[in-house]
Amino acid sequence: MIMQSLFSNKYKFKDTEEKLNAYWDKIKLYKWKNLQGKQFIIDTPPPTISGQLHIGHVFSYCHTDFIARYQRMLGKDVLYPIGFDDNGLPTERLVEKIKKVRAADIDRKEFKALCNEVSAKFRMEFKILFQSLGISYDWDLEYHTISEEIQKLSQMSFIALYNMGKIYRKLQPIFWDCADRTAIARVEVEEKEMSSFMSTIAFSTEAGERINIATTRPELMPACVALFFNPLDIRYQHLQGQYAIVPIFGNKVPILSDEQVKIDKGTGLVMCCTFGDELDVYWWNKHNLNTQIIISKSGTLDLKHNIAETDTLSGKLHGVSIVEARKLVLETLSKCNLLIKKEEILHNVKCAERSGMPIEILLSNQWFIKVVEVKHELLEQVRKINWYPQSMRKQIEMWIDGLNWDWCISRQRYFGIPFPVWYSKRDNEEIIIPDVNELPIDPTETLPQGYSKEEVEADVDVMDTWATSSLSPQFNSIHTGINSIPLVPASLRAQSHEIIRSWAFYTILQAYYHHNSIPWENIMVSGWCLAADKSKMSKSKGNALIPNQLLQEYGADVIRYWAANSRLGSDTVFSDEVLQLGKRLVTKLWNASKFVSMFVSQCQIPDLNYVTETMDKWVLTKLYKVIVKATESFDVFEYCVALDYIESFFWKDFCDNYLELVKKRAYGESVTSKENLSAVNTLSFVLTTLLKMLAPFMPYITEEIYSTLYNNGSIHDHDNWPIVNTSLCNEMDEQLGEDFIEILNQVRKIKANAQLSVKCKIYKLIINSENYDFPTSWENDLKAVCNAEHIVRDKRTSYYDDKFLVSVQFAS
């Protein structure tokens, strides 16, 4: 009987991907059906519209998709939406770059129109990329955060929190990005190592005693409101309650003690300005100090209240940049012999995450969500959530423990969700909030009912992007038509580790305030994809790889395989070697399936009742254990571990050993019908199961093989994950199989050492062992795979370390 394969010689991934994407879309394979009781809801990270996605983004989005596909195959009704975060500063920066405009220089409406245009273009590009990768989103659940539906949800959240007393507006110190001219939250501040100078400056007390101050911010001397020393520092205890004179500016400031001063840092005497850093804010609040703000929102010195004459130093400093002011102050101090020492240093400087520029702390009216007063409650919420890996929970706990500022949610930008607020000019009225039924509203374009434009002032700020993104678990309500903010804890939040302090934390906060609930039961945290030099991939650094180029070269399955080879929570260096391994796996899977396809017509639906032979039972037992391990790993979101078990079985047990030993029985050469049926049913069952377990990782090739061999719907259908069936497991047959493989490996080694082909015929295969009998089918398979004419068993002597000692006599 001539057997023919159902497969072409080479797998053509481009043709397959195009065909299957159209097929999956046509049959709505990933559609959420809203079935009660079998829900698995994923809180998907909406990619920011800030430029093209690079391979690092692909890396983490694939991780979520592995879980979505697995849960769907378990029989769950998976709600897997996709959103795009297209409001806020990142999108504004992109638009300014592409359109070569500045938001501040054109009409607000015109700029917002440009933002909408650019956002729509990039959303379509992202969609095409995600579909090319086989990400199994339900595109009917698509949203974007500047849409009217999301604006309404975000404004509803604001009003609800305002009515609860959890949101307030206040004039207080805030972090200010002078480059983007907006307030930012603490989480948007990062530290950068920069070179600077530590300058030691001569101050004097009011009584004339000389005292020295070391500072990196001499330009803030006009804003100095106190000097501090540690109460245990005997050098300065006599100064308590005295006043100091700030050199060249002449302002008189109190000298006070505080435990926060480090005795061994600088001179031990510290200048407190409004405001140089967070410690200044702490002292200003604690000691009820005066306020002297000298930095403008544009990052220049504002000394108009200090200027007595235009030719004074204050006059020269007014309106110049911070860097230039620092230089002028130091030059003046030096001329006056008040600059004692100027030492070049490297130190950490707090910078705005987006612009990269050093931040300032200014006094400004802003909106805040209360955080500090509920730190304990938030820690309790954090501990109710399952964190994968568990170590990531410590990050957010440390962040919450260290919080001492409420969350500033207002931004002085343009393309964002407006605050639904007007400020009344009527007597005894302050803030006007619209009715929820009027939302969404833009107060700059709408008047509150019963008011004229002369009676109100619109709030022109927009909300922090995170104030909206942190409501992502509730976004599904825009598809269910619920006119509220429902929150059933999602099954899973998947995200990367760098936004634990922002997206994860803020979402936990919102869920606690709105529903006294956790937002999700589980959180799965991915690491970063790093460039070859182990730095984070970034478009601005020029080290980011473009996914489309790699998809054209390797195909989606290989890219997904690469993404799966990363431990949860761990950073992974991009590797061409892993891509080559993925390519090799695709080729081997195709070729192995091509071989099995010759026999599948006999057993389209494998019947394990036909499995009678020892080595068939061995491979089924090994397969059973892989199903158990892969299922256990997927259940705790360890996709990498699951893939490792599956791939190890495929290469080692299935391809290297089982396919070789079973060929003779599969072809039906000189074997009984029973032996042949046992082989082909086992082959079909093992391949089908392997395809199903690989399907979450490599959806295209597994679907192509499955649909070619088995006329049984899509491999990605519900309830298609292999069942853990204990009847597959036979410990005795497994041990016989392991003995078989040990003997086979010894024979292969003998032939290799003799530089003979593995097909070289053996006349006599001699197995030395104690009290060991082998089943007939076992011996027949061993003869076939070793190409041995006879097997001879001898009693082994006790001094051998190995269980078996194998020798051969080759045919002459």
Swiss-Prot record:
ATP binds at residue 539. Belongs to the class-I aminoacyl-tRNA synthetase family. ValS type 2 subfamily. PANTHER family: VALINE--TRNA LIGASE, CHLOROPLASTIC_MITOCHONDRIAL 2, VALYL-TRNA SYNTHETASES. Pfam families: Anticodon_1 (PF08264), tRNA-synt_1 (PF00133). Its EC number is 6.1.1.9. A motif ('KMSKS' region) lies at residues 536-540. One of its GO terms (cellular component) is cytosol. NCBIfam families: PRK13208.1, valS. It comes from the Bacteria. Keywords: Aminoacyl-tRNA synthetase, ATP-binding, Cytoplasm, Ligase, Nucleotide-binding, Protein biosynthesis. One of its GO terms (biological process) is valyl-tRNA aminoacylation. Monomer. It is an enzyme of class 6 (ligase). Its main location: cytoplasm. It catalyses: tRNA(Val) + L-valine + ATP = L-valyl-tRNA(Val) + AMP + diphosphate. GO terms for molecular function: aminoacyl-tRNA deacylase activity; ATP binding; valine-tRNA ligase activity. A motif ('HIGH' region) lies at residues 47-57. It is found in: Cytoplasm. This is Valine--tRNA ligase.
